[in-house]
């Protein structure tokens, strides 16, 4: 068996022969990472990516200076979608090791689930995986209901049914109740709503191949909020939280929805479809209606919703939208505490009115007259949140997935956002 490469930390610069910008050096004893006190976690993550690029698949983190955050930064960069990597972790106290183990279990579940091929992960499989994860951490406190196919239409989940009816794999709504109180009448503290589009072709507003090839990841919001709830439970979440995953394929067929169709929602809103590739908001609307009916103190929806958010922030930040300044500030505080990247983008009352339709109350997409696509998408969703000005956060999760590797991430899912939402739930 190959001996593990030893990885140590140092606050001293590398030998001058490595250059004055060297972040790591190699000697007979292994690899040394040279911390500079400026962005040590980022330095460790980037170095881990380089170590993986050298083909080193077994490492041992040794010596002083390793803690949970530094171990996790190393793993975030070291993990990739292909092959097996083995890490021998340093000695940590029980609390730190438990935290690390929970991250390895749950956030890796999120990354692996998002990376799974669409052929293997349809709407029903995604819902069942979410149930399995949450039952693995708190089965005695979890109940759930899965509604699919024609049952959705009969129960007036018209957005989800309309988007998903074009696929042979029926659309699915997972409604999961985490209630650790034992009181079936306990108030619901929070609702999490996730977009679970397991493959997005764009429908009849079809995507080009260059924009479709990563669309197995269009369920990243659903996977992330599922992981966030599971992770919050491992951190001691003792409040009742409900999870709604809106899962579907968006495909082309003789039964697929078309431009000009009008969707009539349970809350009385009518929406004209003018872009079948703006389907995420159509399925989320059903989840938000259900979430609002619980009258929680907090609603968080998460979705890979718009290219506009990605244009603004790249894959480096999740975009945050809210009318509730206090709540937005709390989430940004949680993000800072967890070293995760979130950035707030504008959401104003006028964005709610920038989706005009000649035939319905709302259009499902903006026009060239109103080009702030990420903000108008958030404005659209607000029509399905009963008290949208308080207690609601919308996250357009641009940092969920990377099509190609970069200096700190392998190609594929990142798992970013799990810790921040869990932090907010347990604060």
Curated annotation (Swiss-Prot):
Signal peptide: none annotated. Mn(2+) 1 binds at residues 200, 277, 279. One of its GO terms (biological process) is proteolysis. Mn(2+) 2 binds at residues 195, 200, 218, 279. It is found in: Cytoplasm. It is an enzyme of class 3 (hydrolase). It catalyses: Release of an N-terminal amino acid, Xaa, from a peptide or arylamide. Xaa is preferably Glu or Asp but may be other amino acids, including Leu, Met, His, Cys and Gln. GO terms for molecular function: manganese ion binding; metalloaminopeptidase activity. InterPro entries: Leucine_aapep/pepB (IPR011356), M17_PepB-like_N (IPR047620), Pept_M17_PepB (IPR008330), Peptidase_M17_C (IPR000819). PROSITE patterns: CYTOSOL_AP. Its cofactor is Mn(2+). The active site is at residues 207, 281. One of its GO terms (cellular component) is cytoplasm. Its EC number is 3.4.11.23. Belongs to the peptidase M17 family. Homohexamer. Probably plays an important role in intracellular peptide degradation. PANTHER family: LEUCINE AMINOPEPTIDASE-RELATED, PEPTIDASE B. This is Peptidase B.
